[in-house]
Amino acid sequence: MHDPLTRRRLFGVTLGAAALAACSAPGQPPAPAGSTPPQAVPPPSSTPPPSSSPHPQGPATELVRSSSGRPQVALTFHGAGDPQVARQVLDVVHQHGARITVLAVGTWLAEHPDAARMIRDGGHELGNHTWSHPALSGYAAEPMYAEIQRCRDKLAELTGSPGNFFRQSQGQHATPEELVEAGKAGYARVLSYDIDSLDWKDPGPAAIRAAVAKARAGSVVSMHFGHPGTVAALPGILTALADRGLTPVTASDLLA
């Protein structure tokens, strides 16, 4: 087994600067429609679900890509938006025999609970992408934890598991504070990414394919449900990966 590259190991000396940058990082996807403001997030429940970690960790470790050398990539999707578009994404990856990881927004799961089963039934992986997709790095500790905890509890309610990964919202890399609160919520690993498809900007299928073409063995790619351009780009992306000998697998498999 090979150790995945971690931001904490490679970039520990710059985490403080990253935290400041993340608080005002431009060019990140906005919160989905219907997102709740910080004050709308209730305090965490006093009793976590049985499926959550009984032994809270210290600060989580941020994972960006794998260093295993295996010819694999992880296509990771932010779970929000029209569930019919999500189904189209799942249909395409099924046709190509690929496996993906979906970091789901809690409010989306609450509104579309069948989506969790649809994803899991396809052999894909689910993880936590906050409750309401806010600019999380700007939150104080308590509401930041509540965003992670509420989505964790919804995942556990719908699937029996809180998922293996948390991903921060509206930021490519986690801040030190986000790593601390994710650890408190029972997540040992925060899943960031080294390749951003920028599909949330709706740049068109060709631009999305060109962005993902930068992926290499071990890459974690960020993509989104809810965007028709992503669906249109996906067959070409999967074909190009196959032509390069790269297999899309879940994040857990990539980082094993």
Predicted region positions:
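N-terminal secretory signal peptides and thylakoid transit peptides that target proteins
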Residues: M1-A18
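Residue-level preference for short coil/turn positions at secondary-structure junctions
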Residues: T6, G69-R70, H96, G122, ...
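Bacterial lipoprotein signal-peptidase II cleavage site
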Residues: C23-P32
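C-terminal domain-boundary segment and adjacent tail
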Residues: P38-P50, H55-G69, H96, L109-E111, ...
